[in-house]
Structure formats: structure tokens, C-alpha cells
């Protein structure tokens, strides 16, 4: 398969880069537009990185490629492509490998031209394009050393502040560094004024991490001897210069005054106090009673690290016993006194009263001689404490929870009273409804226990006359029988006037004139007479049958004996169930 899109994009991007004119903004815009498309066309559909040993489907028209190591994994496309879902059709594509190498070479070429400087100076698109160029340059072989132009390119993006004494010629101070073999990638971050070396081994750079015997010597690269300097006298300008760069990386470094003495309290400005309040988690706890030592690390470069004490709050604190001036209590919340008894009428808002922000912004008055210091509190739990009516203390529980428990108890009592008045022990459905009304999740340890009611003993026989607690004999008089409504037969009915037509087997009684044969059978079932067959005369004797049905069954059975010839004609009885 021929990757047409990637090839066309490479040709167009190469033509624009080779014919680039620094004064042509249109060409610069086209390059910034084509480079991301070219990079996207060479991306793996599984991991999203630049293709390594690319493979592509053979019988497909789509432009989806994956790395050889990503074969068989799920692609990130939504919805998935139906052309390339079968990994058995993927084979190695040499043209894609050539295009990936061409992309790397193109990125290397851009870093050595004036186009790279224009990309860095551009504010709107510099980050995206620099990421693409860095992605392409990282795939270079480790044996090849990047050129010095990449280092100078990084210097233009974030210049290195000099820690030595200012010289008359600033270019002369940078010349030893530019001639050194130290090389920095374009996308590398600069922390504390010196670049990082992430992803490279320690052997690559000859950095001697300072020991306690030699705390201030830094040797970079064995082939170049850099002037050894004493940096302890120039620490304040280093911190002041790099403070702006460190804010973007989440590290907060405050400038120290030069006349700090052991045992004195550390002076903090208003801005530093506010900054420490906003970024408490990222602030390092520093103690000024120890001399700062300059240390160098491989991951972060040389940086200023002060010996710290692990405290409960990440703010700058003083170990001096004498505290003077206004104390800033906004960093640590005010803890309620444990031995003080409070009345129940006091509000919870009086427990913790934070210092108004206006006092911090305005700072101390003109008459105050001592600066703003931070009071060091003892390590006790800072959980808000609420008082119990008996004088003890418990962790703070909001008022809404306590009020809700009281309301739950009241609602539970009212609900139980209503359910007791409405409940009738004779009906099971109402008992179930009462149980559902009783809240199960509202019970607290101090709430009253649930009252259990015993079910009334069910009475045998018919429900007629027992629908109420006091049975009445006039229940079915002029009303529908409850047994009839439930389609049940009346057994041992105690009411008078009940005309329930349901039998014990669940069928209805039929009148004698409706279906004579079936009415006769129902009468037989009601009386419990076992007769295998009942003979009925033909249509000629239908009148006699009607008369017989009106008469008692015993007379009918006595009239028709087995000796009668009319019994030879058996009746065909049909039961419609």
C-alpha cells in the first residue's frame, strides 16, 4: 500500500522549509499548518507516538498504520475502521520507514536554520511546533551529538543567568559554555537557571555531585574545565533572577535577606505569606538557623536546597522563642480552648475566627517596630472542636445533622401515632402498610425502639359477618357478600340474607332453567351424591325433565330406576370448564 497522504505532505513541507524566507509570514504560516498534519500522518493508531518499525494493511485504502510492537492491540479510533481491523493483513511497509526517517531529518534541519528562531519567537504556535520538533529530534541515534545550534536555540528561549561576578563583556562570559560539548534538547525545561538532563545517563555528562567536603564545586564535562567559583556570596541574585521561571513549574522560592543570623526570626513579606497560603502543598519548609548548601542533582540540575525541618504545615516558621510584633495566624487555624466551658446559646461561628485579609494586606502599622512573623503552633489535631452540653469536647458535627436527628425522632413519633390509630388488627393489608410507613433508616441510637404488634388469630369459616372487629349478622343484607367479591364459597357463614352463588370448587351455581343438565350436576356436587351417570329422557320428555328438576332430587332418582327402558339412551353431558 502506498501512503499517499504522508508522501504528499512531506514533499510540500520540505519545499516550504527549503525555500523559507524569514520575511515571508505566509510561508511561516503554511509551515506551521503542514508540520502537524505530517506528524499526524506518521502516528501510530494504537500508542499515538511516532511510528517505529511501521506496519500497514496490504489490501486496504485507509491510511492507518501501527508500530510493530503495537500489533494486535486495540486502536484509539472511534468508530473503529472496518478496513484495517484484521491484523493478519498487516505487513511491514518500507516506504513508511523511509518517511519516518525523512521526518526526523527535516526536524533536525529546522533546528539548524533561522526558522527555529522564528518559531520560538512566535507566541501563538511555538509550543505545538516545538513539541513536534522535539519529538523528531528525540529519535536520533544516541551516538550522534546534537549540534551547538540547538544549545544556542535553547539559550534564546530561556537564557542562563550567570552566577559569577559581572564582567565588562557579557559575551565573553558565555563563550566557554557555547564551546563546550554540553548539548541540550529544544524541549528541555530550565530549572533554577540550569537545564535538565532527563532521559540521559550520568555517564553522558561528567557531573560531580557535590559532597559535604566540596559543596560548591561544579564540574561539567571532563573535556572542558570551567572556572570553579564560590557561589555562597551570590545566592540572593540567583534566587531573584530565577524566581519567575520557577513559578511555572510549581516550585516557590522566596528571596532571603542578606543579614539573616542564626536564632533570628525569618522575615516574610506580605506577598510571600499570601503565596504560601495559596500553594501550601508545593512550599518547602525551610529553617534559617542552618547555612544553605548548594547541591547539584542530575534530574533537576544545580538548585538551591536548604536544610528543612518536617513540620505539620508547609510554611516558613521561626524557632526563636521570643515573638515580637503582629503574628500571622491565617496560616494555622485557631484552635478552641479545651478547658473552657461554653454555653449552648453560643453559635458555632465563634469557634474559629480567621484573621481578616485586610490586616494581612495592610501589614503592620507604622509604629510597629518588629516585622510580621509566623507563630509556630504545637502539633495538635487541628480538627474543629465542638462542645457537648456536659462540658466535654467532641469533633465538630454540623448543626444540620443534629437538627435532622431531632426532626427524624419527631416525625417518627407522629408517624407511629397515626399508624396506630388507623391500624386494624383484623386486616392484614393494613398491617403491612403500617410496617412500610415505619422508617427503617431513621433510627438513631437514642431513638425509641420499634413496637411489634401481634397478628390477630384468624377465625375459621366465612368472612361474612367478620369484616369488622364486632361481627354483625347484617353484613350481607342488601350489600355484596365479601366472599362473593373474592370469588370464594361461603363456609360456615354467620350472616343472614347471603346469596353467594360460588361453590367450593370455584364455579358458580346456575339456575335450574338456564342449563338443566349442568344445574343438576351442580346440585349433585353440592349434596355430595356419587352417581356415575344420570339418564335423562329425550326431547319428547323434556317437559318431564323440567318438572323433575323443579322437584327434589330424591324423587327424581326414585322415579328413574335401572329397570326402565328409557335408561338405554344415555345422556351426553358436556361440562364447559
UniProtKB/Swiss-Prot annotation:
GO BP: DNA damage response; epigenetic regulation of gene expression; positive regulation of DNA-templated transcription; protein monoubiquitination
Residues modified as Phosphoserine: 447
Signal sequence region: none
Disruption outcome: Perinatal lethality. Both male and female embryos show developmental defects ranging from mild to severe, including eye malformations hemorrhage, and brain and kidney defects. Defects are probably caused by defects in gene dosage and loss of biallelic expression of target genes: in mutant cells, one allele remains active, retaining active histone modifications and transcription factor-binding, whereas the other allele is silenced, exhibiting loss of promoter-enhancer contacts and the acquisition of DNA methylation.
EC number: 2.3.2.27
Annotated region described as Sufficient for interaction with MSL1, given as residue ranges: 1-116
Gene3D superfamilies: Zinc/RING finger domain, C3HC4 (zinc finger)
InterPro entries linked: MSL2 (IPR037922), Msl2-CXC (IPR032049), Msl2_Znf-RING (IPR032043), Tesmin/TSO1-like_CXC (IPR033467), Znf_RING (IPR001841), Znf_RING/FYVE/PHD (IPR013083)
Binding site for Zn(2+) 2: 62, 64, 81, 84
Function of the molecule: Non-catalytic component of the MSL histone acetyltransferase complex, a multiprotein complex that mediates the majority of histone H4 acetylation at 'Lys-16' (H4K16ac), an epigenetic mark that prevents chromatin compaction. The MSL complex is required for chromosome stability and genome integrity by maintaining homeostatic levels of H4K16ac. The MSL complex is also involved in gene dosage by promoting up-regulation of genes expressed by the X chromosome. X up-regulation is required to compensate for autosomal biallelic expression.
Record's protein name: E3 ubiquitin-protein ligase MSL2
Classification of source organism: Eukaryota, Metazoa, Chordata, Craniata, Vertebrata
Gene transcribed to yield this protein: Msl2
Amino acid at each position: 500500500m502506498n501512503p499517499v497522504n504522508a508522501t504528499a505532505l512531506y514533499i510540500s513541507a520540505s519545499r516550504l522549509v527549503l525555500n523559507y524566507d524569514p520575511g515571508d509570514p505566509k510561508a511561516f504560516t503554511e509551515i506551521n499548518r503542514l508540520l502537524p498534519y505530517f506528524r499526524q500522518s506518521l502516528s501510530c493508531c494504537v500508542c499515538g507516538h511516532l511510528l517505529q518499525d511501521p506496519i500497514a494493511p496490504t489490501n486496504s485504502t485507509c491510511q492507518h498504520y501501527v508500530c510493530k510492537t503495537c500489533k494486535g492491540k486495540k486502536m484509539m479510533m472511534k468508530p473503529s475502521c472496518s478496513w484495517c481491523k484484521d491484523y493478519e493483513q498487516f505487513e511491514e511497509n518500507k516506504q513508511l520507514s523511509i518517511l519516518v526517517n525523512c521526518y526526523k531529518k527535516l526536524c533536525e534541519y529546522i533546528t539548524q536554520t533561522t526558522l527555529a528562531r522564528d518559531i520560538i519567537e512566535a507566541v501563538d504556535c511555538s509550543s505545538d511546533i516545538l513539541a513536534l520538533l522535539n519529538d523528531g529530534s528525540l529519535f536520533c541515534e544516541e551516538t550522534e551529538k546534537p549540534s551547538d545550534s540547538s544549545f544556542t536555540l535553547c539559550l534564546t528561549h530561556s537564557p542562563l543567568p550567570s552566577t559569577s561576578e559581572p564582567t565588562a563583556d557579557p559575551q565573553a562570559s558565555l563563550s566557554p559554555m557555547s564551546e563546550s560539548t554540553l548539548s541540550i534538547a529544544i524541549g528541555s525545561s530550565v530549572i533554577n537557571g540550569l537545564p535538565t538532563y532527563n532521559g540521559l545517563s550520568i555517564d553522558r555528562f561528567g557531573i560531580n555531585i557535590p559532597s559535604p567536603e566540596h559543596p560548591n564545586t561544579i564540574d561539567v564535562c571532563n573535556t572542558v574545565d570551567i572556572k570553579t567559583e564560590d557561589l555562597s556570596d551570590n545566592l540572593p541574585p540567583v534566587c531573584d533572577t530565577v524566581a519567575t521561571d520557577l513559578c511555572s513549574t510549581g516550585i516557590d522560592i522566596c528571596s532571603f535577606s542578606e543579614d539573616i543570623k542564626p536564632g533570628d526570626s525569618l522575615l516574610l513579606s506580605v506577598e510571600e505569606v499570601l503565596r504560601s497560603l495559596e500553594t501550601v502543598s508545593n512550599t518547602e519548609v525551610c529553617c534559617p538557623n542552618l547555612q544553605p548548601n548548594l547541591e547539584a542533582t542530575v534530574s533537576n540540575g544545580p538548585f538551591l536546597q536548604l536544610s528543612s525541618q518536617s513540620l505539620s504545615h508547609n510554611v516558613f516558621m521561626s524557632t526563636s522563642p521570643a515573638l515580637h510584633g503582629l503574628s500571622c495566624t491565617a496560616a494555622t487555624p485557631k484552635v478552641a480552648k479545651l478547658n473552657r466551658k461554653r454555653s449552648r446559646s453560643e453559635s458555632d461561628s465563634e469557634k474559629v475566627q480567621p484573621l481578616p485579609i485586610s490586616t494581612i494586606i495592610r501589614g503592620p502599622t507604622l509604629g510597629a517596630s518588629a516585622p510580621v512573623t509566623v507563630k509556630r503552633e504545637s502539633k495538635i489535631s487541628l480538627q474543629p472542636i465542638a462542645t457537648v452540653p456536659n462540658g466535654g469536647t467532641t469533633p465538630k458535627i454540623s448543626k444540620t445533622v443534629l437538627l435532622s436527628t431531632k426532626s427524624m425522632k419527631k416525625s417518627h413519633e407522629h408517624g407511629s401515632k397515626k399508624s396506630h390509630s388507623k391500624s386494624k388488627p383484623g386486616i392484614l393489608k393494613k398491617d403491612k402498610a403500617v410496617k412500610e410507613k415505619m422508617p427503617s433508616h431513621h433510627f438513631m441510637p437514642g431513638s425509641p425502639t420499634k413496637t411489634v404488634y401481634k397478628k390477630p388469630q384468624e377465625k375459621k369459616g366465612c368472612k361474612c359477618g367478620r369484616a369488622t372487629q364486632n361481627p354483625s349478622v347484617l353484613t350481607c343484607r342488601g350489600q355484596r357478600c365479601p366472599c362473593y367479591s373474592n370469588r370464594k364459597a361461603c363456609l360456615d357463614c354467620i350472616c343472614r340474607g347471603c346469596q353467594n352463588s360460588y361453590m367450593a370448587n370455584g364455579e358458580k351455581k346456575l339456575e335450574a332453567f338456564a342449563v338443566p343438565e349442568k344445574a343438576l350436576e351442580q346440585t349433585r356436587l353440592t349434596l355430595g351424591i356419587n352417581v356415575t351417570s344420570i339418564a335423562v329422557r329425550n326431547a319428547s320428555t323434556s317437559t318431564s325433565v323440567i318438572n323433575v328438576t323443579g322437584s327434589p332430587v330424591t324423587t327424581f332418582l326414585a322415579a328413574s330406576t335401572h329397570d326402565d327402558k328409557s335408561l338405554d339412551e344415555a345422556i351426553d353431558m358436556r361440562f364447559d370448564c
